[in-house]
Amino acid sequence: GKLFVMHDHSFYRTTGLREFSWNLTFDEIEQLDAGSFFSDAYAGEKIPGLEEVIQLAKENHVRLNIEIKPSANDKDIEKSVVDLVREMDFADSCVISSQMYGSLQKVKDYDPEISTLYVMSLAYGNINRLKAADGFSMEAGNATPSMVSRIHNAGKQIYVWTVNNRKTINRMIDLNVDNIITDRVALVQECIYDSKTNDVIRQYVKFLREL
């Protein structure tokens, strides 16, 4: 089968078709309209294949967070993803994430060098034992200073989602999270720039005071 990019297991929410992904061929999937759900301006947009998305990311120097959502109907989807990432020489430009820790273990078995993220509500317990996870991805509201410190002290990273307002973006920057998942990329970039500029100003003021 061919890997494609879709958030849900069912096509209904975004295409109106009451069908599960594993019941259609990719040729049939390509005929669906996945754009009208968002806006008439996107009517006719197709569900993309993962290969197509990776190629677009490479051409535009964009890193990807590839989330694997396995089901009982998938046959070793982890190997298929790893093989495609390797084939397209994209391993250093992506992170593979999943809510299923077993999927991350399989990814690491196939390629220990690929970065992985465990998608979870909270990073609790002994996170050091989760060897197959290079980091954790969680809802931003669950991120706390102590949690960020525990994750960083374990040598792992923390990604937060989905952060779309300035106040929460700035709070995540102050928490020193490693990655902010957002629908408003330009706003996040602006906040990061402002934060760094403010740091420079603070350091300069401190320098002047110490003269």
Predicted segments, located by residue:
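Active-site-adjacent beta-strand anchor residues
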Residues: E67, I96-S98, T162, I181-T182
